[in-house]
């Protein structure tokens, strides 16, 4: 499986009657064996911090953070080579954000998958990214390491992006 996409709003990709079935949807459609499907569901749940006690509950009755983790698990269960996430931490509390970020880093490290995160949170980007592409009106306007991109705070703010708090502090101390 090549590319997996996780939408910004998990409600748009959750539709099965149970958490287990939702995570299993992709692998089931890949025509995998029941044993392989079960293995992938449990592995993806582990990567995303979903307790197996939730497997028989409806995903639609869970919290926003739980829904987001289930949506991510459903895509991870297909083992994509490239995982694309649109605003994966939007609307989450700081603890939820950290957990999602840690889970994504663990997934990338264990599988070697490319993880692409679309985000307006420059603090998240600074913590997670090895390479940053900044787009403005559909065009790439910056491409580099976090250090290279965040060394240009005026350009970032000029296109409506904030700079990470650490960058703001460093600029204030100069």
Language model segments and positions:
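H-loop/switch region of ABC-family ATPase nucleotide-binding domains
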Residues: 119-120
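Conserved catalytic motifs of ABC-family nucleotide-binding domains
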Residues: 79
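Conserved ABC ATPase "signature" region
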Residues: 35-53
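Conserved ABC ATPase signature
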Residues: 58-62, 66
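Catalytic Walker B motif of ABC-type/P-loop ATPase nucleotide-binding domains
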Residues: 83-86
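A short, surface-exposed alpha-helical micro-motif characterized by mixed small hydrophobic
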Residues: 125-127
